[in-house]
Regions:
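Conserved, well-structured ligand/cofactor-binding cores
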Residues: 1-163
Length: 163
């Protein structure tokens, strides 16, 4: 429509970014499963002798740290998604604004879900300094992007419910 001609190039660029982001998130699903396998294996290691216990602890610590990497990346990608959704909600068609609200809610849910996967691993880490750093990064993403997703959702709800 003529009404959206001024932002058509912006929307096309957003579509390209969103498609690339979707593909990255899909790949992270498998990466998350792949990262869990070594952690599961570490839990199964024997700890009957002091040497075995020390080996298990070291392997487990490394696996816990690695198991945080993918959920943190998922969180970063969800944050990118929320930023894209802000633009869609501001520039997109009124007929598609509900899609922006849905995307904001889903990105927020995925962001929060991924944070739980970080927290369950950091809780079990022996290196409390490393765990605190990972928790701080997770908290920062939650603090910024949950509120931004909520703002998009509220804005879209307002547009849909009020004339």
């Amino acid at each position: 429509k003529k009404k959206y001609a001024a932002v058509e190039a912006d929307i096309q660029a957003l579509n390209t970014k969103a498609d690339a982001l979707r593909k990255e998130l899909e790949a992270l699903v498998q990466a998350d499963a792949d990262a869990f396998a070594p952690l599961a294996a570490a839990y199964g290691l024997p700890k009957d002798t002091p040497e075995q216990a020390a080996h298990k602890a070291a392997v487990l610590e490394k696996a816990l740290d690695a198991a945080c990497a993918v959920p943190l990346e998922v969180m970063e990608k969800c944050a990118e998604g929320i930023a894209l959704v802000e633009e869609y909600a501001a520039k997109g068609s009124v007929m598609a604004v509900s899609d922006a609200g849905c995307a904001a809610a889903l990105c927020k849910a995925a962001l929060q879900a991924a944070s739980l996967n970080v927290f369950i691993n950091t809780k079990l880490m022996a290196d409390r300094e490393r765990a605190a750093a990972l928790d701080a990064k997770t908290d920062k993403l939650l603090d910024e992007f949950v509120s931004r997703a909520d703002a998009v959702f509220a804005s879209v709800t307002n547009k849909l419910r009020n004339k």
